[in-house]
C-alpha cells in the first residue's frame, strides 16, 4: 500500500479522516482550533496508544501554527508572527531554568538549513550571566548548539546533544529542524510545535537517532518547519484531486527514487522563518520586547 509521507500531526489527522470518513470520531485524539496574533493554530493531542496507532505518532501535544498570512506582509506581520511562535514556546516549556537550543540540519543544504538559521538569531546568555552579572543577571541562561550533520562531523546529532545536556543540565531542550509536508500549501507556511521530541533529518529523508525525553533525560520541545514535499506524495494527491483511478497509484508504489520538491525561493523563505523562530524563542524565554531583541543581536 502506498503511504503518503508527512511529518505534521495535523496532516496525519487529515489522512485518517480521508480514509475513515469525517463522520467517524477518532478515539484517543483530540483536535482544537484557535487564533493567536491573527494566525490560526490547530492543536492535535494524541492521548493514548489507540491515538498513536491511528496517526503513527507518539502520544503528546502537536500544535500547528499557520503562517500563510505572514507572506502577505501585512501590518505588524513580523512582530505578530514572533509573538505567535513565542506563545507556543512559552506554553510548552518550563518557565525557569537553563535552556539549550539546538539548530538541527545542514546549513549547506538550503531546505535543511532552518535549524542553524534559527540558532543564529538566538540570544546567547549563559556565559554572560557569570561574566557580567551587573548587566545580565536578570536574563535566563540560554546556550545554543549547531551540531551539523553526520556526514561532515562524524558525530550523530543525538550524541553531541546528549553530551552537552549531561554537562549543562538544561531544564528543557528546544530543537529546531526541517520537516516534510504532504501539501505544497503548507511548505514554509506552518510551524509545528511538539512536546514529544524529534528525529533529526526526518524532513529530508535522512532519519537519525531521536532527541526526546527518553534519550536525553530532559523535556524536549520540537519546533519544525516543513520545507519540502515528498514527490510521490505530491503526485498521489494530484492524481486523487483529478479523480484518476486507483491503478494509477501503482506507478508511485513501484518507483524507487526518493525525490523532494521545494519552492523556488526557498533561500529567502528559510532565512525569514529562521529569524521568526529564533526571535520567537527569545521572546518566550527572556522578558524583552522585539525591539530590544533586535538591539541585542545587532
Which residues does each predicted region cover?
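N-terminal amphipathic/basic leader segments beginning at the initiator methionine
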Residues: 1-59
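An N-terminal, well-structured beta->alpha segment
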Residues: 50-94
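Conserved active-site and cofactor/substrate-binding residues in soluble primary-metabolism enzymes
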Residues: 60, 76, 80, 84, ...
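Short glycine-rich or small-residue beta-strand-to-loop segments that form or flank ligand, phosphate
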Residues: 66-68, 98-109, 144-148
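Gly/Ser/Thr-rich loops at beta-strand to alpha-helix junctions
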Residues: 104-112, 151, 178-182
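Glycine-rich phosphate/diphosphate-binding loop of Rossmann-like nucleotide-binding domains
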Residues: 106-140, 144
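A structural-propensity feature for long, helix-poor, extended segments
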Residues: 137-165, 169
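A structural signal for small-residue-enriched, beta-sheet-centric alpha/beta enzyme cores
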Residues: 145-146, 175-298
Amino acid at each position: 500500500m502506498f503511504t503518503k509521507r508527512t511529518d505534521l500531526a495535523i496532516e496525519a489527522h487529515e489522512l485518517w479522516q480521508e480514509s475513515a470518513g469525517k463522520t467517524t470520531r477518532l478515539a484517543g485524539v483530540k483536535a482544537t482550533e484557535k487564533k493567536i496574533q491573527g494566525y490560526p493554530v490547530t492543536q492535535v493531542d494524541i492521548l493514548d496508544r489507540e491515538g498513536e496507532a491511528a496517526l503513527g505518532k507518539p502520544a503528546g501535544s502537536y500544535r500547528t501554527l499557520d503562517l500563510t498570512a505572514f507572506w502577505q506582509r501585512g501590518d505588524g506581520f513580523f512582530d505578530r508572527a514572533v509573538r505567535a511562535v513565542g506563545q507556543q514556546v512559552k506554553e510548552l516549556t518550563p518557565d525557569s531554568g537553563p535552556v539549550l537550543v539546538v539548530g538541527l540540519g545542514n546549513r549547506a543544504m538550503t531546505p535543511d538549513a532552518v535549524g542553524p538559521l534559527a540558532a543564529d538569531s538566538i540570544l546567547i546568555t549563559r556565559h554572560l550571566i557569570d561574566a557580567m552579572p551587573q548587566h545580565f543577571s536578570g536574563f535566563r541562561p540560554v546556550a545554543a548548539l549547531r551540531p551539523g550533520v553526520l556526514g561532515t562531523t562524524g558525530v550523530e546529532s543525538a550524541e553531541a546533544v546528549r553530551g552537552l545536556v549531561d554537562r549543562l543540565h538544561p531544564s528543557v531542550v528546544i530543537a529546531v529542524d526541517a520537516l516534510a509536508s504532504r501539501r505544497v500549501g503548507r511548505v514554509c507556511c506552518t510551524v509545528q510545535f511538539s512536546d514529544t521530541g524529534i528525529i533529526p533529518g526526518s524532513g529530508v529523508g535522512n532519519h537519525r537517532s531521536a532527541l526526546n525525553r527518553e534519550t536525553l533525560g530532559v523535556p524536549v520541545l520540537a519546533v519544525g518547519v516543513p520545507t519540502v514535499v515528498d514527490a510521490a506524495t505530491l503526485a498521489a494527491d494530484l492524481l486523487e484531486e483529478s479523480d484518476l483511478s486507483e491503478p494509477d497509484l501503482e506507478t508511485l508504489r513501484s518507483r524507487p527514487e526518493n525525490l523532494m520538491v521545494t519552492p523556488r525561493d526557498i533561500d529567502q523563505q528559510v532565512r525569514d522563518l529562521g529569524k521568526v523562530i529564533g526571535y520567537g524563542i527569545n521572546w518566550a524565554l527572556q522578558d524583552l520586547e522585539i525591539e530590544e531583541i533586535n538591539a541585542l543581536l545587532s
